[in-house]
């Protein structure tokens, strides 16, 4: 039996995990797995805990929570020999879904800790201005384990599920603020998305994909750099994508009206949005940049958007513009199910 370190977020699933954690402990105990539990106490704490386990003798470092908890634990052990396990207990759980871990099945997820399949996935190094403080939400801290930024004041994080900005990051900000906390799963993200769309105010930006020429865009719509097919609790944002390849996938849909954004939610859930209105595209991508425009309308790396354009990494608001994203292969060892979706 493996010896595992469990890093659990008691606030996951709007606090339900903390109230029901005894059920997970009972299931772990009955499975014969030797385990230790480390409870997180706030944003970033799972990175600290996980980074301290890089040289430990645990067979697995297990994230118990949602995609945000997975994001932090993965940042803490990325680049080491440690392997990530997951017991999904969040609202989205899209990374667990992407590596074949069953959702809403605690025993099924625990069984995979012992008898699952091992994989290695890529990661996206993201560097940008750290997001400012928000009422009740501190500005993200720098952790040495994620690597040094190229510019003072910047933040570095690694993403393993998705990176997004604009309207979709407004969704994550409202989630952090506790909107619709009585709703869980995909339905929660649907309500949040409707509210975010109706309150969104247009912003312009400059973007550059790989070696293509940079150009200006109206951010009314979406952009997402994806390493899995879904986020937001199952929305098929990048149909056919999986985290085992040699690049990410970028989904761009700019200049959409609010009516179009509302009408695309149904197709987005089913993965039928690409090509719609001639405005939504999906392509492979290894690097991406986004910057604000200066008063003369030129891209600038000296300052960000005003108001800030938030960038979410794996569902966690971390940065504001200017931001650079770079895909790197072979960054994280994971344990998942025998048949992850879309893996050939």
Identify the residue ranges that each predicted region occupies.
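ATP/NTP phosphate-donor binding region
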Residues: 1-61, 71, 341
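Glycine-rich beta-alpha junction loops
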Residues: 10, 128-130, 163-167, 227-230, ...
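Glycine-rich beta-strand-to-loop/alpha-helix junction loops that act as flexible
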Residues: 10, 64-66, 87-90
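ATP/nucleoside-binding phosphotransfer catalytic cores, i.e., glycine-rich phosphate-binding loops
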Residues: 17, 209-212, 236-237, 242-243, ...
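Catalytic core of DAGKc-family lipid kinases
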Residues: 31, 79-83, 87-222
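Short Gly/Thr/Asp-enriched flexible loops that form oxyanion-binding sites at enzyme active sites
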Residues: 69-82
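Glycine-rich phosphate/pyrophosphate-binding beta-alpha loops
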Residues: 164, 168, 224-238, 317
């Amino acid at each position: 039996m493996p010896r595992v370190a469990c890093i659990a977020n008691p606030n996951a699933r709007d606090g339900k995990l903390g109230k029901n954690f005894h059920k997970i402990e009972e299931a772990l105990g009955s499975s014969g797995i030797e385990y230790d539990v480390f409870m997180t106490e706030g944003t970033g704490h799972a990175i600290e805990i996980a980074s301290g386990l890089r040289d430990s003798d645990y067979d697995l470092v297990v994230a118990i929570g949602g995609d945000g908890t997975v994001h932090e634990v993965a940042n803490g052990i990325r680049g080491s020999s440690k392997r990530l396990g997951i017991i999904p207990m969040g609202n989205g759980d899209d990374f667990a879904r992407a590596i074949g871990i069953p959702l809403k099945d605690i025993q099924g997820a625990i069984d995979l800790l012992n008898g699952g399949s091992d994989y290695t996935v890529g990661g996206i190094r993201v560097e940008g201005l750290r997001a400012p403080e928000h009422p009740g939400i501190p500005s993200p801290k720098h952790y040495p384990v994620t690597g040094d930024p190229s510019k003072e004041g910047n933040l570095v994080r690694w993403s393993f599920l998705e990176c997004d900005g604009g309207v979709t990051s407004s969704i994550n900000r409202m989630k952090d603020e506790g909107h619709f906390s009585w709703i869980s799963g995909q339905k929660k993200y649907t309500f949040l998305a409707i509210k975010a769309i109706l309150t969104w105010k247009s912003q312009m930006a400059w973007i550059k994909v790989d070696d293509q020429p940079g150009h200006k865009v109206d951010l009314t719509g979406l952009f997402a750099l994806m390493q899995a097919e879904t986020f937001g609790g199952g929305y098929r944002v990048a149909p056919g994508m999986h985290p085992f390849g040699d690049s990410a996938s970028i989904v761009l849909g700019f200049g959409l009206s609010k009516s179009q954004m509302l009408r695309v939610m149904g197709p987005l859930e089913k993965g039928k949005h690409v090509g719609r209105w001639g405005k939504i595209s999906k392509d492979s991508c290894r690097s991406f940049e986004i910057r604000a425009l200066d008063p003369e309308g030129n891209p600038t790396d000296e300052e960000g958007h005003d108001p800030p354009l938030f960038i979410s990494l794996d569902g966690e608001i971390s940065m504001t513009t200017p931001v650079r994203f770079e895909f790197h292969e072979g960054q994280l060892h994971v344990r998942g199910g025998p048949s992850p979706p879309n893996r050939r």
